[in-house]
């Protein structure tokens, strides 16, 4: 938000192309960007507004951004070599492994289909992976759907989540410590 707002008044800024040089539109875009990190539900700044005679549904746009970020949780966001060799807390590693084990997420006709790919491990361990990582992924999708329901119902957006699983010998397994973490 700060970056956008500071560039609105900078005459030499190239960012003005992002909001067509219109400072009011720039402020609206900054609000949507900011919404990604705050609880905006009851904030009147996110009520519907207008721009050049058009209705702008800031709350809905902000809700869709939060949902989009939640759905952008696949393995394209993970560098497994860095993850397995980095010194970050276990809970953070587990968060990124959640992304690593999601091959893709597709949305069609209000059905969210999540394609997981886990390492080729014992059946019992695989069930633990499925249970933990499916729950974590679905939790955040359901959280967004519930939290932003007042916005999503205006566009008839609700979800059914379907999960598909496969295994691969090329997928890295969790370390013993991380595996114990997901079993707690």
Task: Set out the residue ranges of the language-model regions.
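Histidine/acidic-rich helix-loop-helix segments that form or flank divalent-metal centers
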Residues: 2-84
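C-terminal effector/catalytic modules and regulatory tails appended to multi-domain proteins
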Residues: 46-184
């Amino acid at each position: 938000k700060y970056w956008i707002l500071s560039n609105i008044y900078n005459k030499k800024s190239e960012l003005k192309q992002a909001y067509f040089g219109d400072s009011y539109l720039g402020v609206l875009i900054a609000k949507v960007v900011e919404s990604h990190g705050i609880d905006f539900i009851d904030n009147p700044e996110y009520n519907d507004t207008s721009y050049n005679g058009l209705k702008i549904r800031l709350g809905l746009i902000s809700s869709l951004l939060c949902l989009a970020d939640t759905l952008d949780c696949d393995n394209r966001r993970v560098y497994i070599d860095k993850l397995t060799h980095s010194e970050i807390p276990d809970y953070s590693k587990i968060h990124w492994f959640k992304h690593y084990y999601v091959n893709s997420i597709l949305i069609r006709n209000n059905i969210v289909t999540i394609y997981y790919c886990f390492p080729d491990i014992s059946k019992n361990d695989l069930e633990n992976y499925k249970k933990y990582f499916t729950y974590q992924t679905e939790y955040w999708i359901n959280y967004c759907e519930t939290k932003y329901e007042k916005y999503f119902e205006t566009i008839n957006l609700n979800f059914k989540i379907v999960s598909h699983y496969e295994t691969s010998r090329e997928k890295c397994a969790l370390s013993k410590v991380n595996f114990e973490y997901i079993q707690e």
